[in-house]
Amino acid sequence: MLRKIIRHLIHFYNRLRLRNRNFSLITNTCIGGIMYHELKMRFLSPTINCGIRDHEEFFTFCRHLDHYLSLPLQFIPSQWKYPVAELRGKHGDIKVYFTHYHSEDEARTKWEERKKRVNPDNIIILMDGDNCTTRQIESFNALPQQRKAIITMDEHPDVPSAWAVADPNYKQAQILEYGLWNQTIRWYELMDYVHFFNTGKIRDNALFRLKKKNRKTA
């Protein structure tokens, strides 16, 4: 019961603080859909409940976003229980894994429906990059979008768009898990993502972590 109350208060506080309410959040994992849901926002992005697992492909997708959003999905044989499709563009093919969809028709319908809602004047890029190399983190930082953040395991103080979990208890690929306050706080909530959505500036969430070493906050 206490956990439920705390989660409710966190969501209420975040919704109260949110001023930027028509942004399109482009992500490489399911993190975007969770954030939209917790903020009670309409999905203004096609990258909901799906993922682009190859980091280089995600960079290409973001770098040429208008081009790839203009392309139809081409579904390919999948070894998993969920559909997999490609966006076959002039800059290379992008493979999209529709992890939380049951059929190609469902995946295609939702992708097409949501990509029509994309706000080209309010694009935010958020990447789960805790297994990225330093070179890949720097490649992300070079993307043309002004508002972008990559979540990493370790500190990269010289990369303005990098935000690190930097917690000894954090394990790779757990960014969506509840790992703090007796399984009440998700790991990504250590980042003040509402402030990031509002301002484009990256900082720690002072509610859950007062100070982190070697982090330049904005």
Whereabouts are the PLM-identified features?
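Membrane-proximal basic amphipathic "stem/tether" segments
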Residues: 1-21, 204-218
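Positively charged, amphipathic N-terminal segments that serve as targeting/anchoring signals
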Residues: 18-21, 26-127, 146, 163-170
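Short glycine-/acidic-enriched loop or helix-start segments at secondary-structure transitions
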Residues: 35, 134-137, 160
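A short acidic, amphipathic alpha-helical/loop segment
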Residues: 113, 135-140
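A short, gly/pro- and small-residue-rich
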Residues: 138-155
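Polybasic, proline/glycine-rich intrinsically disordered low-complexity segments
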Residues: 153-206
